[in-house]
Amino acid sequence: ITLSELEENLVLIAQNQGHKLHCIQTNAEHEIINAIHDAKLKNNISSIVINPGAFTHTSIAIRDALSGVEIPFYEVHISDINNREDFRKFSYLSDIAKKVFSGQGLKGYELALNDAIKNNLEK
C-alpha cells in the first residue's frame, strides 16, 4: 500500500463517521512543528494522529509543540519500538500521548483514527 492509498483509506473512514481528516507527511522537524501549531491556530483540529518516526527518540521540540497546543494526540509506530534497538525504545511523546499504537503495522493508523473519533464524540 502506498502513502497516498493509506491516506485515502483514512480520509474515507473519517468521512464515513462524519469527520474531516487533514493528512501531512514531512521529514522536516520544523514543518511538523508548524503543522502542530497550525492545527490549533488555523485549522480547528480536535485530535492529532502522529507517527513521529525517528523524532520519537530525539525531539523535545515536537513534544513541546504537542504539549503547547493542548490537542489530544495519538502516537503511531508501524513497528513495535519496544522490540527494537535500545535507543529506539524511548519516546519523548508516549507519556503525554492520549494513546500509543505501536507494532500494529499500518492498521495502527486506523486504530488511532477511530480512537480519536470515538473520544471526540464523547466530549
Regions found by a protein language model. Name each.
Residues 27-31, 53-54, 104:
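Short beta->alpha linker loops
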Residues 1-15:
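Short catalytic helix/loop segments, enriched in acidic residues and glycine
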Residues 10, 35-36, 62:
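Aromatic/hydrophobic pocket-lining residues that form π-stacking "cages" and hydrophobic walls in ligand
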Residues 17-21, 44:
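A generic structural motif
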Residues 20-23, 83-123:
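Short, glycine-/small-residue-rich phosphate/pyrophosphate-handling segment
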Residues 34-43:
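Short, well-structured alpha-helical segments in soluble
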Residues 44-82:
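Mid-chain, well-packed structural core segment of small domains
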